[in-house]
Amino acid sequence: MELNVDSAKQLLAEHEQELQSAHDAHSILLASQPITAATTHPNATASNAARAVPVVAPSSVPTPTAASTPFISTQPPAPAQTGRMQLIDEQQKFNSADFSPHLENWGLADAGFGYDLCAVLGSQSTGKSTLLNKLFGTNFDVMSESARQQTTKGIWMCKGLKMNVLVMDVEGTDGRERGEDQDFERKSALFSMASAEVLIVNLWEHQVGLYQGANMGLLKTVFEVNLGLFQASRAKTAGAKDKTLLLFVIRDHIGVTPLENLSATIMADLTKIWHSLSKPQGLELSKITDFFDFMFTTLPHKILQPAEFDKAVDVLRNRFVNPKDPNFVFKTEYHKRIPADGLAHYLESIWEQVMTNKDLDLPTQQELLAQFRCDEIANVAFAHFATSIKDFRKHIEGGSVVESLGADMALHRSTALSKFDRDASRYHQEVYKRKRIDLLDKLNGSLSPFFLGQLKNLHRLMLQSFKQAVLDRMRTEPNYDFGEVVSSEKRTALAKFSAAAQAVLLTDTDWTIDDEVVELDVEIQSISDTMRVEETKKMVAQIERTFNKNIGEPVELALKSAKRSMWDEVLISFSTLLEQAEATYVRKATSFNCTDDENEHALLALRRKSWMSMRAKVDEQTADSVIAAKLRNSFEDGFRYDDAGVPRVWKPEDDMDGAFRKARDETLELIALYAKIQAVDTTLMRELRSKFEDAEPVGLVVEDEAFDWHATLSVLSETRKNDIGMRFRKEADAMYVEAKRATVSSIAQVPLWMYGVMLVLGWNELMAILSSPVYFAFLLVLIASAYIVWRLNLSGPLISVLRAVANEVHRLADAQLRTHFSQPLREPRPPAESRPAEQIELEPN
């Protein structure tokens, strides 16, 4: 929707040749005098060439779209969160008391030139505040839809959201509240035009071509007063005139009349007004474009076309935030060159001049010339100064500490001030002194980043040096006192930092290192605390490893023999080792300067971890396989051995069933004994309960899981107890059946006549064996072997071994047979008569 107003430029063509050379000189001068921001700002980084765009954007520039500007949000910005202030109230009183605090809250007090200022002008209830809120994310009050009445009273100011732009919302003109009293309208319009870089003129499409409706009468008065009050004294100085951009925003544009025609109408009216002005001496031939640049844009109807309105506002916002936009509005030549910290005084002085100079009493020509020349000389001196300090940035930003930085900064600053004093001291002394102070502040502002960067690098270097020195002493000193080491190295680091920081402090500055020293002290203390925590953790970990190593054997020995006092032995060993671990911690923690809370928390954590380590050993000794072996051994001791420990040989008359039941029941009782840690001595349990169950966690450390000491006393759950009992019963039943079978086989009877038959039938074989020493000896060996197998009850294992041997022999034989039969059969040789004689003779046998 942005078009070039070619027709308007044609109306002004006859005046261009007269002041073209002056305009070129003005551009060259501005290019050599860049605005240097004290803080990073998008406008400060844009080149002057990029900003030197004439009256309106070229017609060849297409309308920006959301696709061509992906960095522009398609949604309106959120309301500003930094607050607003009433700069000038309804009684025309300037609110200087609240300006500086608001500037601090907005983060612009130290912005230097890194800010921009714009204002809006227009009739009452034309949506000025709504437009500003949409464009900049401000939170100015807007008119209620239900009652068309004055909303903005006086002049309000707010900072744009996420941009260093100060926005002034000016009370609307032609309001019924003030009626014919146009005094405040003129003053507020003149104030806005004199102070703002960009003045947004908000009007409806149907107001274009009107005289009062388009505020042309007001603009005529403002142009004339502004020209006489602020510009006449600079008429003879080429390129020194301040320029302001007038951005006409034509609202409720329906598209019937092109923007080109609307802008041409407005430019024609403005040119006519300018020609009718009573110009001061020296400005009779001046053109309106010598003091103002113009841009024009349109917006659709906000109510009838809300989507198109929002999209157009987004495109318009790009002019204010994107320095690369060809229609970027905050150009260098529009900036008033007032540092942010002096903005309050500057705006107040403008308002006082507007209020009190009824007859347009101007400052003297001497003061005006002094102001201009001092600014010019200061800019030249600062340019040489900026060139001479460029090398500092590379070293400082590279993280290096420049030892001679203080002396070098003082030398370059003194050189710049000397150049300024030599050339500027001839002019008005009050202006010279004021400008010298301004230059000194500017020089100090340029050196301040190097000063802060040097402190930052020193800060980082001292932290590294402190940490490395502490670690080196901890490695080289075997019996070091951690608290003494930290205190000593801390004093050394702070002393070195203070000495190096004092070397870069310059006179005539408000620089101080007190905050940096305090910050360094805090960070060193933080590093010390971190190192102390790490060393404490290492110490506790070493104590835990020692405890784990020592607790294993006592637990294993105590649980190996199942008896009622086994848990007493385990807990006594645990308490003894825990006391040793706590004593070791307390002895070593003394040198770490740990607080009582830290010690209490560490001891509590040590107790809990030690207990869990002991529980882990208990779990190892009560695993299913281990506890099954323990139960089996206990059962065998009671069933297969008598009270004297002699193996039993069961006879038919022995009470095997009673012995089996007794051994089984006694063994099953052991499961309940292993299931829970319960000492016979209740004193032990009370002491442990006081250490674990009654203690509350201390400090800021939160454990991953809640510690439930009472729950850790349970070793075997009910499910595990049932499973272990069932498996044991099966094993015990198997042992009983085996013993019973051996007894039954021993009492089986053979008929007596069978022995006679065997003797008669086997008499010959018997005599052959008895008469042969070899057979007889072999018979004796078999009888002895059988007796041994029977006596030691090895029949079961022997059968298992024989079965395994048979299976292995079967496997090997099967493998050999498969290998043999898997080979192909050799073909038989053909008979000799079917082969040639030569082949038969040559063929080997």
Curated annotation (Swiss-Prot):
Gene3D superfamilies: P-loop containing nucleotide triphosphate hydrolases. GO terms for biological process: endoplasmic reticulum membrane fusion. One of its GO terms (cellular component) is endoplasmic reticulum. It is a multi-pass membrane protein. The chain crosses the membrane at residues 750-770, 774-794. Cooperates with the reticulon proteins and tubule-shaping DP1 family proteins to generate and maintain the structure of the tubular endoplasmic reticulum network. Has GTPase activity, which is required for its function in ER organization. This is Protein SEY1. It comes from Mycosarcoma maydis (Corn smut fungus). The lineage of its organism: Eukaryota, Fungi, Dikarya, Basidiomycota, Ustilaginomycotina. The gene is SEY1.
